[in-house]
Amino acid sequence: MMKKPLIVLTGPTAVGKTKLSIALAKAVGGEIISADSMQVYKYMDIGSAKIRKEEMDGVPHYLVDVLDPAEEFHIVKFQEMAKEAMEKIYANGHIPILVGGTGFYIQAIVKDIDFTENEENTEVRAKWEQFAKENGADALHEELAKIDPKSAESIPAGNVKRVVRALEFYELSGKRISEHNEEQKAKGSPYNFAYFVLNDHRELLYERIEKRIDEMLEEGLVEEVQGLKDRGFTKNMVSMQGLGYKEILDYLDGNLTLEEAVYILKRDTRHFAKRQLTWFRREPEVSWVHKYEYDYDNEKILAAMLDVLKEKGIVTA
């Protein structure tokens, strides 16, 4: 059976994916699925750098502005929603283009990672949750380190939910969750895909990040977060943990001055971009697109991307 086509356009935050994604979609007859853990939420426009209606230029977008901030958005939900969108796009005779910077989300689609076969048992889970309550998160994390050191390395002790999940998985299946995840990643892709990573010189990227945050503040980021707060959204919600939201919330709650909040936001966004790039470097089969090699000209970048897509038989010459 012929593999269905899939295009990925990713890269670190503030690198300039949005504009290029529209040009790409128009050139190949594509529709865009957002692979972004924040743009999926309603009322969170400025801090998530959400694409505006007029920027979409008629290109259909999925997974943008669809969830209430009180709803949890996680990898399994993303995968479900994205696959549903892909079916619609294929039915339209178009090519799905995954656009966004959340590497794990992209991998879940490209590799079609199976999260559902992870058995669940509320009794076992409750036992470990109780253990954490009585002995603390660090003691729980030590239990994980004993049976699955690899998972313990990648899951922080503070993420009790994931630590419990890993312990539960081991108890039920007799298998380490890290091994299960490695097996899933080693699978081939069910798609004929091209995976583009847009990148730039680090110092220029950092400059863009700083500038973008200054612009967000000018556009009314503080007011946006205040509005969310007024609607009853609190900092323990997944949505409010996003970059730009948790820092401004800390300012509004009187824990930081605005200057401190902005300093932390800029610093943490730079760190985030660095982590994104580390993730993409570990991914096999990616096509790096360094903007400076094309004189920062989107037309030249697009032409190079189209060459790759023709080579892979995703689009015809």
Q: What residue spans do the PLM features occupy?
A:
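Phosphate/pyrophosphate-binding catalytic cores of soluble transferases and nucleic-acid-acting enzymes
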Residues: 1-317
